[in-house]
């Protein structure tokens, strides 16, 4: 799909603006920095998970000690004004152990520990008043219990038990015998959504959109059919081959495969896009055989019925195939870099920009995904098992991206990243329609 260029946004202060870091590949090995010591070997073989603080450090996030965390940044580097966040990036100091907010990722991380957005009776919160949190949750005001409808752990340091619990939460497993029990109903246990580190958030045309660091990718079944076998269950997307099998799950829990699966001795940290997707006029049903009803932008007279359906990751996910490394694209379909390079970004770039997917493409995607005959395969989304329809929102990088050969992160270029405040939905909707029209024009060329 055609990308929206920086030139299309220049001069428009109300345009869609977001932070999106490209994926960064780093070797997990012994390091002199205090945030990642002892988590690998000198031959770059993966040994075990980084704990959360160490993983954040690898991504450039400096986490202060909990004892001195004041709840809000006190350095004045990042400020929150009029619903938006504006931060000045600084060069990353990978060996720094002080508590300065040293780069744009750290600044966004710390400024996000407060209410982020309000949408259709749902309050999206990241962190708490006292300690920084890696995860987020959503509280629906319409529930009498006041309990968060989406939930994930908020711990900064995990032991083995927490790692296992995280895997079960992310992938829909809840089992101690290593048997395949992927149909566990985790909603009853409060474990219904994957974890993301939010790097930016906005409300766009009555839709909640955020850029985030991927910690897992899971779809949530929103079918209203009480007889559906998948009702209220988490739908797992695997980032490791054979994760639906006993061996794949056991290997991941025992930390032998790596968080996303090792490729050529490298550990992949995917710090890139993620989306909350809108659904308008969604039809339920256990087999979801009716026509796809998702549309974007949502019309003004139907915005009240728009629903946040599920999460989608628009980043290459590591898996294994007969012809090399395979990935999921934004529709959850299985592509191969060697066989379909024109559809995918390069391995060295991995900065993904997706256009708006129309209904016919979604329908085709569902039909394609249904063509898989292997029930244990997790290389394609099984659309017959979910009433969720995935629709990527065009949410893209706003800074001037350097030429090939000089691809560095924004904070390494002393760039400025600004997250714009939400504006009136009808105004933003017109802007998105213009983007959509430009995308269609470019695609037809």
Swiss-Prot record:
Residue ranges the record marks as coiled coil: none
Highest taxon of the lineage: Bacteria
Q: Which InterPro entries match?
A: MgpC
Q: Where is this region: Disordered?
A: 23-44
Per UniProt, the ranges with Low complexity bias are 31-43
Q: Which family does it belong to?
A: Belongs to the MgpC family.
Question: Under what name is this protein listed?
Answer: Putative MgpC-like protein MPN_464
